[in-house]
């Protein structure tokens, strides 16, 4: 009744997987084309739970894919295009070999091409899904946009990545959705809030590239091919949400302001407009010009008594968010030629500030360094020869730290030639028991509106504190001597006295704490062996974290003391 008995490895998990070579033969594709197809369709290898069973008893290392994924790829239209491209290459080589140049031109004109629109719709059914998965796409496009025009990558791909990345930056500026920025060894990390989704991407520094040899650029190019299509769709939809023209165009007033005589010297005529957009110093034009409406107010409804606290907290957070968006409103910046212009211009404009630079540095300058309305001059030099009185000369780190602190920090710590404070990461959130550096504590106090003493004032008071400590030590020694003398006198003259008793007042909080500790101890005693083992593991981890935090605190204390000693030595020399 049961039918024929199946052989070993013909049922169960062994039939759910297929090796890479078998999948490739099933699709009739070469290995590079198979990899390319899997990247575009989002198909990835899987590690079976019982690898030996799936591998039919063998322990040889093999790559496995789900059989249902490979069956899904059989119906993909791009597979046919890959085969057509294979035939195209063969015909082109044959025409080259025969030196039939007319045939070469004709075959080139009929080069097979394909679109990835249907794959984008298939992988991202809703627009929010596409926005949520934009982190890697942004990082890859920003990386490719900085590549030199060498043989490693196609020039068209580099130009496309640059155009899409500039479009996205202009959207972030117009929507004021930038939230965090961090300078790391790898590059500059940005975090933005796009339609309620948090996106984090990294952009490389503007240094010359030395292409590594251990990187497969074909795989990277395939990912970039997919990501550029995705980013193009997303940019178009994002521009529509803000009523901006797409492809982006400069505002008519901004276009007049940005006109300069040396445009043809800086870039080709075909690239001038793109370079003006990439300068990020001008606003974009809208489909229907919107009038500024600053009187918009949030509707207020009768507060629910149960959720009154939650509503107040949300209202406070909304106000802080709006305040953060307009951090640099009313401030006018000028960037010296030695500072990272692209990053600073993007950040300053994202928070409502105005920015410009010397016209000889880059196209897109809106005013020069002699403008009397400039409030902040960003420089990265030890000293400035000629300074204008009515502006601050600051190092670039001030801009980044202000964004992360969500307020305008004191400028005294960022003057040219001053030793800069540490650049704290905004992506680190300390938990209970973690080590918090003093700079972070000072910053948290500033955000709450508290005033803490500066390091310089603390250093001046060190000598006074040491003198007070010496006086306290002398008083304690005198007290101990008196106690010893009283003890000796008491041993010689033992006078028995009867004193009235006192009623002991119980501390309720202490009693409650003792009861709580007793309950906890009894609960631990009643635990099962497994639960007790897990509890001990958790407690061990917490204690280890506290020990590490204490070690860091001691190291920091020793470092601060060494710095103070060094300062005193320098002061004595002078």
UniProtKB/Swiss-Prot annotation:
Residue span of region Disordered: 289-312, 452-486
GO cellular component, one term: preribosome, large subunit precursor
Comp. bias regions, Acidic residues: 292-303, 453-477
Keyword rRNA processing attributed: yes
Keyword rRNA processing recorded: yes
Keywords for this protein: Nucleus, Ribosome biogenesis, rRNA processing
Molecular functions (GO terms): ribonucleoprotein complex binding; RNA binding
Residue span(s) of domain BRCT: 323-416
SMART domains registered for this protein in UniProt: BRCT
GO BP term, pick one: maturation of 5.8S rRNA from tricistronic rRNA transcript (SSU-rRNA, 5.8S rRNA, LSU-rRNA)
Gene3D superfamilies in the record: BRCT domain
Compartments (UniProt record): Nucleus, Nucleolus; Nucleus, Nucleoplasm
UniProt cross-references to CDD domains, sorted A to Z: BRCT_pescadillo_like (cd17709)
Superkingdom per UniProt: Eukaryota
Complex and partners: Component of the PeBoW complex, composed of bop1, pes1 and wdr12. The complex is held together by bop1, which interacts with pes1 via its N-terminal domain and with wdr12 via a high-affinity interaction between the seven-bladed beta-propeller domains of the 2 proteins. The PeBoW complex associates with the 66S pre-ribosome.
Cross-referenced PANTHER family: PESCADILLO - RELATED, PESCADILLO HOMOLOG
Alphabetical list of HAMAP family matching this protein: Pescadillo
Similarity-based family: Belongs to the pescadillo family.
Function summary: Component of the PeBoW complex, which is required for maturation of 28S and 5.8S ribosomal RNAs and formation of the 60S ribosome. Required for neural crest migration and eye development.
Identification of the protein by name: Pescadillo homolog
Gene: pes1
């Amino acid at each position: 009744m049961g039918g024929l008995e199946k052989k070993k490895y013909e049922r169960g998990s062994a039939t759910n997987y297929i090796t890479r070579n078998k999948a490739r033969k099933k699709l009739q594709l070469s290995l590079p084309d198979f990899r390319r197809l899997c990247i575009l369709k989002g198909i990835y290898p899987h590690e079976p739970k019982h690898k030996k069973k799936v591998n039919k008893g063998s322990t040889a290392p093999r790559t496995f894919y789900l059989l249902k994924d490979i069956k899904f790829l059989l119906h993909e239209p791009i597979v046919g295009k890959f085969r057509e491209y294979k035939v195209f290459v063969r015909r082109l080589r044959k025409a080259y070999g025969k030196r039939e140049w007319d045939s070469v031109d004709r075959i080139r004109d009929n080069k097979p091409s394909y679109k990835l629109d249907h794959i984008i719709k298939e992988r991202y059914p809703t627009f929010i899904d596409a926005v949520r998965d934009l982190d890697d796409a942004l990082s890859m496009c920003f990386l490719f946009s900085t590549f030199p025009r060498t043989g490693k990558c196609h020039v068209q791909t580099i130009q496309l990545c640059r155009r899409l990345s500039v479009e996205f930056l202009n959207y972030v500026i117009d929507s004021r959705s930038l939230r965090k920025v961090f300078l790391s060894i790898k590059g500059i990390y940005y975090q933005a809030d796009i339609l309620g989704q948090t996106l984090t991407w990294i952009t490389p520094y503007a240094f010359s590239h030395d292409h590594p040899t251990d990187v497969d650029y074909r795989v990277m190019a395939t990912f970039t091919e997919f990501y550029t299509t995705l980013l193009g769709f997303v940019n178009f939809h994002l521009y529509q949400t803000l009523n901006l023209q797409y492809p982006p165009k400069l505002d008519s007033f901004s276009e007049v302001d940005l006109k300069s005589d040396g445009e043809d010297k800086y870039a080709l005529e075909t690239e001038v407009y793109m370079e003006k957009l990439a300068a990020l110093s001008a606003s974009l034009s809208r489909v229907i010009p919107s009038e500024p409406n600053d009187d918009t107010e949030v509707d207020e409804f009768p507060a629910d008594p149960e959720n009154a606290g939650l509503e107040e907290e949300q209202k406070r957070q909304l106000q802080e968010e709006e305040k953060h968006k307009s951090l640099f409103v009313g401030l006018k910046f000028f960037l010296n030629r030695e500072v990272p212009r692209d990053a600073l211009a993007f950040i300053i404009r994202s928070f409502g500030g105005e920015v410009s630079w010397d016209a000889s540095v880059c196209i897109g300058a809106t005013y020069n360094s002699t403008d009397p309305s400039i409030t902040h001059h960003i420089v990265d030099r030890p000293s400035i020869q000629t300074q204008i009185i009515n502006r601050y000369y600051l190092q670039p780190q001030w801009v980044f730290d202000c964004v992360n602190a969500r307020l305008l920090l004191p400028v005294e710590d960022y003057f040219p030639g001053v030793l800069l404070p540490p650049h704290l990461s905004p992506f680190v959130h300390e938990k209970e028991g973690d080590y918090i550096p003093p700079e972070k504590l000072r910053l948290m106090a500033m955000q709450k509106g508290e005033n803490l003493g500066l390091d310089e004032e603390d250093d001046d008071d060190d000598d006074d504190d040491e003198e007070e400590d010496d006086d306290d030590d002398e008083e304690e020694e005198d007290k101990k001597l008196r106690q010893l003398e009283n003890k000796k006198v008491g041993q010689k003259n033992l006078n028995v006295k009867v004193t009235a008793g006192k009623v002991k007042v119980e501390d309720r909080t202490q009693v409650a704490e003792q009861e709580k500790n007793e309950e906890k101890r009894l609960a631990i005693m009643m635990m099962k062996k497994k639960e007790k083992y897990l509890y001990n593991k958790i407690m061990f981890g917490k204690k280890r974290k506290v020990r590490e935090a204490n070690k860091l605190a001691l190291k920091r204390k020793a470092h601060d003391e060494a710095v103070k000693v060094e300062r005193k030595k320098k002061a004595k020399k002078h």
